[in-house]
């Protein structure tokens, strides 16, 4: 077992310090070895699905791999939603799964399934270790594969890796276990993506042929140096809420409302001849349709990605460098381009006060206005997590006023599962305030996020409880069907009050605007416990208000 007992030290030497394990018998050698390593921080989370998302949140904060440890059988499958999200969101995770000896697979033995390559192509790499841990060659193999797994997880694009480890009985150590102190550690320097001077000259020559260039940012971590550089570029940048470009001078964050509201003649003036995209997944359906429907638009992607999705169906150039380098090496300047920037900014200048005026005058208590108020109360340097469905879309429509806020969302796969656990894990790794805005289905789906012994007092949960999946009332298809309530909206009558009591969280319920404003005065203040702010609304009224908002913005162009 010496090779197994040395795995924690190898990972520590690579800078890995965080471990989330779920209790089990077959994984005992791993659990004991990691828990007895004095320099690792161990969190024990019983629910494997929640554990994996908590690990995802921790890695989002640290930008280092978090280790996941589980027993054999279905436990490993429960990691799958978070592994897929980590793969597409490019978050490093290292899964260590215990397994039965290979000869016992498919022999009707308990907790025994086919675990090899269980995550398929959603894991960056899979490594199968031997069950014969005492052999010298096996020790060498273990050291080599663990080192390789860490390097692959951290190589761009970052992502999850899986190491499957079979154990024979007996696997519980008797007495102390011995750490060798000097296991083999293999470091790998990450390559730099660079282009030659001739390539940059060619890129600049092509760039000069375009007169109206529009940058589009997908999901991207907050990067102050990039934000400063973007602010000095003479081009409009469309920044979604998850692009973390809010507050930058030439960034357009009202594109969703803008593209569905302005007259067609004005829309034509906003059409670029080149779109340069960067970052991950895009949220806006209308932005995608706007670019896809204009066949004359060319599309470049900037980023050192292995694969580049042709999201606009116009991709013609891939530049495999980070955007910072691209902006440093190229120049975008022309009178036409300056006019193009101003057209976009003028349209946004019209939209922003209209959004503010609508929400300050709205008398019906609803989710959209509630999110507007919550976002306006966010403290400086807020860490904001957004659940999928309407929460992230409301925020994308409204924009973030706090320039230094960092925004996160599980947009890798855009599922509702694990959003509370992700924010929970992030909160465990920072002393700063972490806020999650979530709908009721995502909240109750992931209620086991709170089922552990770690209670971050810096966690703030804003629960938009309309007692169902409100997004389905916003969509033309399901909203017109008689099965809307039962098959799509999934009406429920739950409240977070008892969950808050059970897990020691401060709880406030708001059913009107005055109650919300009063609650927000103290909600973000420091406290000994985490807090839940439950905002109860009616889904029918929410839909009516949001549709009225869109109509109001459209009419503002006619007045």
UniProtKB/Swiss-Prot annotation:
Q: Which reaction does it catalyse?
A: isochorismate + 2-oxoglutarate + H(+) = 5-enolpyruvoyl-6-hydroxy-2-succinyl-cyclohex-3-ene-1-carboxylate + CO2
User: How is the cofactor bound, in the record's words?
Assistant: Binds 1 thiamine pyrophosphate per subunit.
Q: Which InterPro entries match?
A: MenaQ_synth_MenD, MenD_middle, THDP-binding, Thiamin_PyroP_enz_TPP-bd_dom
PANTHER family the record matches:
2-SUCCINYL-5-ENOLPYRUVYL-6-HYDROXY-3-CYCLOHEXENE-1-CARBOXYLATE SYNTHASE, PROTEIN PHYLLO, CHLOROPLASTIC
Class of this enzyme: transferase
Its recorded name reads 2-succinyl-5-enolpyruvyl-6-hydroxy-3-cyclohexene-1-carboxylate synthase
* Role played: Catalyzes the thiamine diphosphate-dependent decarboxylation of 2-oxoglutarate and the subsequent addition of the resulting succinic semialdehyde-thiamine pyrophosphate anion to isochorismate to yield 2-succinyl-5-enolpyruvyl-6-hydroxy-3-cyclohexene-1-carboxylate (SEPHCHC).
Keyword Coiled coil among UniProt keywords: no
One Gene Ontology biological process: menaquinone biosynthetic process
Family affiliation: Belongs to the TPP enzyme family. MenD subfamily.
| Keyword entries, A-Z | Magnesium, Manganese, Menaquinone biosynthesis, Metal-binding, Thiamine pyrophosphate, Transferase
The UniProt entry, under Pfam families, shows: TPP_enzyme_M_2 (PF16582), TPP_enzyme_N (PF02776)
Which terms does the record give in the GO molecular function aspect?
Answer: 2-succinyl-5-enolpyruvyl-6-hydroxy-3-cyclohexene-1-carboxylic-acid synthase activity; magnesium ion binding; manganese ion binding; thiamine pyrophosphate binding
Q: How does it assemble?
A: Homodimer.
Task: Look up the EC number in the record and give it.
Answer: 2.2.1.9
Q: What cofactors are annotated for this protein?
A: Mg(2+); Mn(2+); thiamine diphosphate
Record-linked SUPFAM superfamilies: Thiamin diphosphate-binding fold (THDP-binding)
Q: In which pathway does it act?
A: Quinol/quinone metabolism; 1,4-dihydroxy-2-naphthoate biosynthesis; 1,4-dihydroxy-2-naphthoate from chorismate: step 2/7; Quinol/quinone metabolism; menaquinone biosynthesis
